[in-house]
C-alpha cells in the first residue's frame, strides 16, 4: 500500500523526507519516539493545536494524530521534498493552508484487491477490515481534490509514477 511506496521512494532518494506524525496513543512494541511517531499527552497535543503547531490534525478512535509543522518546514527550507502519508481529511486541511502543495492519491486497483491486502497482513479482525474498506471507499470520493492519482496495481510502476510526478513538479515553469 501507501507505506510500501513511501519506503521505496525514501530508500531511493536521499533528498526526500517523510514527516513523522504526532499521536496521543501509547507506543506499540518496537515504535521509537521521533522515528515512528512523536508521542504526546492529550494536554501537550491540544496546546500545540492551539499554538498552530500542526499542519493537520484529527481525532481517530479516541486518540489525536497530527503532522507537526516545524519539522516539515525545516526540511522544506533545507531543499528537501517532504512526504506526508496522511488520510484525505488531513490532506484537505493541508491543502487549505498550503494550496501549492502537491497532492497524490494512491488508489488500490479494486476494493477486492484492497480487502485481500488487508487480510494478507493478518493483523485485523473481520470487523476492522470492514471499517477499513468503508473508510477507503469514502476516501475515494475526495479524488477530485487531488492533483494526481496513482493506481497501485504494480508496486514498481506505482513507485516509478510517484517519482515521475515529483520530478515533473520540480521541472514546472510556473
Predicted regions: what they are:
Residues 30, 74-77, 95-99, 141-143:
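Conserved catalytic network of the ASCE P-loop NTPase/AAA+ motor domain
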Amino acid at each position: 500500500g501507501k507505506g510500501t511506496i513511501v519506503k521505496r521512494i525514501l530508500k531511493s532518494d536521499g533528498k526526500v523526507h517523510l514527516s513523522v506524525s504526532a499521536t496521543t496513543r501509547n507506543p506499540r512494541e518496537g515504535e521509537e519516539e521521533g522515528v515512528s511517531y512523536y508521542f504526546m499527552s492529550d494536554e501537550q497535543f491540544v496546546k500545540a493545536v492551539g499554538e498552530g503547531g500542526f499542519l493537520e490534525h484529527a481525532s481517530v478512535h479516541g486518540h489525536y494524530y497530527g503532522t507537526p509543522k516545524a519539522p516539515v518546514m525545516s526540511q522544506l527550507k533545507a531543499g528537501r521534498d517532504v512526504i506526508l502519508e496522511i488520510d484525505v481529511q488531513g490532506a484537505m486541511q493541508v491543502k487549505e493552508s498550503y494550496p501549492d502543495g502537491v497532492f497524490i492519491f494512491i488508489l488500490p486497483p479494486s476494493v477486492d484487491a484492497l480487502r485481500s491486502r488487508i487480510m494478507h497482513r493478518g493483523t485485523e479482525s473481520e470487523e476492522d477490515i470492514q471499517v477499513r474498506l468503508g473508510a477507503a471507499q469514502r476516501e475515494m470520493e475526495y479524488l477530485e481534490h487531488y492533483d494526481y492519482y496513482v493506481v497501485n496495481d504494480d508496486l514498481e510502476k506505482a513507485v516509478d509514477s510517484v517519482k515521475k510526478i515529483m520530478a515533473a513538479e520540480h521541472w514546472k515553469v510556473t
